[in-house]
Regions:
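Bacterial Sec-dependent N-terminal signal peptides
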Residues: 1-25
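Function-determining sites in protein domains
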Residues: 20-233
């Protein structure tokens, strides 16, 4: 078999969310982990109709959800890393040599449950319906993109076409959900370009308004919500 050698150029390494027009589908068949269960239990309150879960690489997890009973947006943030706490409880460090240790999964033992803080801001039914409509269309349009290709030379001088893998170095995970459907994107915490970038930016502004208990700032986002819905539609 002939070896293929090539140089990975920095231009090939892209943050996937940049100029992204669609969210990515979430695998419904994927096994639910202890971490997934704790994210739901700690960050998705009862009576949640739709929402978003934010999973940063170097900060603590949070969520923005809509409570259909309270007619309010709820922002919930963990006071420590849920991922770190669940990993600590479900793994143990095992010696594999004189100076080599490896993490091995185990049954849940001692678990230090993360704390959470919750903020609530009532919104109009009009805004709730607009957000619901936006969430639904954005999630329903989730799709995997076509991979980009480039030409490269093998060691014997032949030119071949290879697929460029999109690589995300850490970043923030954003997962949107509505009535059992979920879609996600991995990128940074500043939104980005394209429709998905605008959706992230809107989510951040809504989150800030709830955290600051600023009804006026939240209401001012109505036109932005309607405009973004038209873009997705």
């Amino acid at each position: 078999m002939k070896k293929l050698s090539f140089i990975l150029l920095l231009s090939f390494i892209g943050i996937y969310m940049n100029a992204q027009e669609h969210l990515l589908p979430v695998d419904k068949k994927a096994k639910e982990t202890f971490y997934d269960k704790e994210i739901k239990r700690l960050l998705i309150p009862d009576d949640t109709e739709f929402g978003m879960i934010c999973k940063p690489s170097f900060e603590f997890e949070s969520s923005l959800t809509y409570d259909s009973e309270a007619h309010a947006l709820i922002y919930t943030e963990a006071d420590t890393s849920i991922w770190s706490r669940t990993f600590e409880a479900s793994h143990r460090l095992e010696r594999k040599g004189e100076s080599v240790f490896m993490w091995k999964s185990q049954q849940i033992t001692f678990y230090r449950v993360p704390g959470t803080k919750m903020y609530m801001l009532p919104i109009s039914d009009e805004m709730a319906q607009s957000l619901k409509r936006l969430w639904k269309v954005a999630i329903n349009q989730a799709e995997f993109p076509e991979k980009e290709r480039t030409k490269m030379k093998t060691e014997d001088g032949k030119v071949i076409t290879v697929e460029i893998e999109e690589i995300v170095l850490d970043g923030t995970g954003w997962e949107y959900f509505f009535k059992g459907k979920r879609a996600k994107i991995q990128g940074d915490d500043k939104g980005g370009k394209g429709k998905v970038g605008s959706l992230i930016n809107l989510t951040i502004e809504l989150r800030n308004a709830v955290r600051e208990n600023d009804s006026q700032k939240c209401a001012a986002l109505q036109s932005q919500i309607d405009s973004l819905y038209k873009e997705f539609k």
